[in-house]
Amino acid sequence: MAETAYTPRLRTEYDRKIKSALTEKFGYANVMQVPRLDKVVLNMGIGEAVNDRKKAETAAADLSLIAGQKAVVTYSRVAIATFKLRENQPIGCKVTLRKAKMYEFIDRLINVALPRVRDFRGLNPKSFDGRGNYSLGIKEHIIFPEIDFDKAGESWGMDITVCTTATTDDEARALLTAFNFPFRQ
């Protein structure tokens, strides 16, 4: 028997509504010119991991819970004496999401995690890099429902980069606005 493959809600919405709306707005001649989400990179920089290796492993475990995919511990490449940092010491962790997991994460970020941020007034609309990618920072990783507030010993910040195939910031802004990213006015 053939089973139907699972398609994330945001991917279905992109295929049905967003793609045609962007084609109409920007007047693309080819369907492949329409910008789409490429990947989402989650990064946690753990400064305290220099003194305690367990903190990097704990952060990687938390990031794996948030992303639904195993996180990789990142190591320093050069020694910096002022930070008491030697080469190949753990300093953080990261994970790259693509395809279905990417759409699921963005759905949870927009609808569940960002509304839980204290004094949230919207995302900064100027955080595009000039090539159609958007980056945002979160001060506490405990805003995600996968992290139990009581069991989390510490709360770390994290960087989230949404990479798109858009060539300009305006195209990327239109794409992310169509995905209901809550930008400040």
Curated annotation (Swiss-Prot):
InterPro entries in alphabetical order: Ribosomal_uL5, Ribosomal_uL5_bac-type, Ribosomal_uL5_C, Ribosomal_uL5_CS, Ribosomal_uL5_dom_sf, Ribosomal_uL5_N
Similarity section: Belongs to the universal ribosomal protein uL5 family.
One of the protein's GO biological processes: translation
Name used for this protein in its record: Large ribosomal subunit protein uL5
HAMAP family in UniProt: Ribosomal_uL5_B
Taxonomic placement: Bacteria, Pseudomonadati, Pseudomonadota, Alphaproteobacteria, Hyphomicrobiales
Function: This is one of the proteins that bind and probably mediate the attachment of the 5S RNA into the large ribosomal subunit, where it forms part of the central protuberance. In the 70S ribosome it contacts protein S13 of the 30S subunit (bridge B1b), connecting the 2 subunits; this bridge is implicated in subunit movement. Contacts the P site tRNA; the 5S rRNA and some of its associated proteins might help stabilize positioning of ribosome-bound tRNAs.
Taxonomic source organism: Bradyrhizobium sp. (strain ORS 278)
Coiled coil: none
Assigned keywords, A-Z: Ribonucleoprotein, Ribosomal protein, RNA-binding, rRNA-binding, tRNA-binding
One Gene Ontology CC term in the entry: ribosome
UniProt keyword Acyltransferase, yes or no: no
